[in-house]
Design a protein with these regions (language model features):
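A compositional/biophysical signature of low hydrophobicity enriched in polar/charged and small residues
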Residues: 1-145
Length: 145
């Protein structure tokens, strides 16, 4: 479990993962060494799993993002999972309950590239595609408290 100070530190790092120990110390009322120790323990317990850079896919020519619902053909579940893992344009994928087995997000440079990727996948699964127009809520954590 985490306490209120841990949650405060995590929240601050979620807003800006480059925030200095000095700034985190001022925010929390702890010393910099105490903050460093708390963060080390949170990392050790894998509460904090990493630090990342948010990049705009369009900067690399990926003009379209899509959500793909994927339903493997009979006997193809493992192959479909392997295919998704090996196609680098898939940026996220969740195995889910319900009619579909996977819901995935992918970034492509064009509709033609999307068609090619889906044509290859359709040998193993049925797919349903929705082009993302806007993301009003970016990936985030639920409230910690």
């Amino acid at each position: 479990m985490t306490d209120e100070i841990d949650q405060l530190l995590i929240g601050a790092l979620m807003e800006d993962s480059r925030k200095s120990l000095k700034a985190l110390a001022a925010l929390s009322g702890l010393s910099s060494p105490s903050v460093a120790e708390r963060i080390r323990k949170l990392e050790e317990r894998e509460v904090i799993k990493g630090y990342t850079v948010e990049v705009d896919p369009k900067a690399f020519g990926y003009q379209l993002q899509a959500i793909i619902r994927i339903r493997p053909l009979p006997g193809q579940l493992q192959e479909v999972e392997r295919q998704i893992q090996n196609i680098p344009q898939f940026t996220e994928c969740d195995k889910v309950t319900g009619e579909d087995c996977f819901i995935a997000r992918l970034s492509v440079r064009s509709i033609e590239q999307l068609d090619t990727l889906l044509d290859n996948l359709n040998a193993y699964a049925e797919t349903n595609t929705a082009i993302i127009k806007k993301s009003p809520v970016k990936r985030r954590l639920p409230p910690m408290a």
